[in-house]
Swiss-Prot record:
InterPro entries: Ribosomal_bL9 (IPR000244), Ribosomal_bL9/RNase_H1_N (IPR009027), Ribosomal_bL9_bac/chp (IPR020594), Ribosomal_bL9_C (IPR020069), Ribosomal_bL9_C_sf (IPR036791), Ribosomal_bL9_N (IPR020070), Ribosomal_bL9_N_sf (IPR036935)
UniProtKB keywords: Ribonucleoprotein, Ribosomal protein, RNA-binding, rRNA-binding
Family statement: Belongs to the bacterial ribosomal protein bL9 family.
HAMAP family linked to this entry: Ribosomal_bL9
Protein species of origin: Clostridium botulinum (strain Eklund 17B / Type B)
One GO biological process term: translation
Protein name (record): Large ribosomal subunit protein bL9
One GO MF term: structural constituent of ribosome
Coiled-coil stretches noted in the UniProt entry, renumbered to this chain: none
GO cellular component: ribonucleoprotein complex; ribosome
Domain of life: Bacteria
Amino acid sequence: MKVILLQDVKKIGKKGEVIEASDGYARNFLFPRKLAQEATDSNMHILNNKKENERKKKLAEIEAAQKLAGELKGKEITIKTKIGESGKLFGAITSKDIASLIKTQYNVEIDKKKIVMDTIKLAGNYDIEVKLYPEVSTKMKVNILPQ
């Protein structure tokens, strides 16, 4: 019997997959626990529509991320802060600081977790990476100057 999995089932398959299961296993285990439903024509049509909608949504998200990456590519962020005699900062510049500066300077809100960088503790010029989507990222420059 062909069934559509409604949830991930260990050693069987993932949500949305169409698998072949024995009649007894499907009727006595999968169906009562709402883990699967029978793969009828109407259920298959609904599943295909859901997959198509998810694919379109993902493509739209990737397109938006690529557009944003194009806008941010090569942009510079200049930070003026107090610096000690040896060039060390009083405090440090973190991804949270960079995210708030991107928001103020370019009016683009980016989650701090999407900014890939080490904590900046010295004055100078740095390259950071902003991962907007798993396959989409861009590089930006950060300049740390004395106040």
